[in-house]
Curated annotation (Swiss-Prot):
Disordered, as annotated region: 163-232
Cysteine-cysteine disulfides: none
Name listed for the protein in its UniProt record: Ashwin
Residue list for modification Phosphoserine: S112, S182, S184, S189, S193
Amino acid sequence: MAGDVGGRSCTDAELLLHPELLSQEFLLLTLEQKNIAVENEVRVNKDNLTDLYVQHAIPLPQRDLPKNRWGKMMEKKREHHEVKNDTKRSSAVDGLRKRPLIVFDGSSTSTSIKVKRTENGADDRLKPLAQIGSTSDAFWKSPNSSSRISPLVLFSNLPVNHKMEHNNNDTQQNHDLMNRKSPSGPVKSPPLSPVGTTPVKLKRAAPKEEAEATNHLKPPEVKRKIQHVTWP
């Protein structure tokens, strides 16, 4: 059963919500199916049938409640139920929204951002490590530069060079002393030691003057200075 309401087609369910559009026979049939007693006076008048239908047969919550105690109690429950549904709907919408909406207004662009600068903060961090000292400057030179040699190589080579110079001086002095003390005649070689005997090595003690001279000739040992690298 379908009809037209306001120039548009309506389904049967929509017609049940508008009893004024229903026929008198349909209203009586609906009330009888609901087991609602209808008096003879009410059967004759369609307006009375419509009121009875709205009171007992129309789908909830469009149904009109009676003006008694039970009707007032049901009306309060209906209002409470509607308020609860509204709160549930609003909470569901808020739950779906991950974060609150940001409303942009032009006033936020007028704020200025201030950056606090320290006296030595960023400048010290941007300084290269080569400015720490001259030794570190030489150390951080690339290996391709042939003009300067890293101080580590110089420090490692110094003791070896001093030892070789000292040994050369000792051999030269020993040679001069032997020529001075040896006679003009031929030098006799010592007899060969027999087999099985171990040769005895004699050490000649150098005089005090020569020892002092060698000590003066020996350059002072250069101590390797430990450079502590401090990171900014």
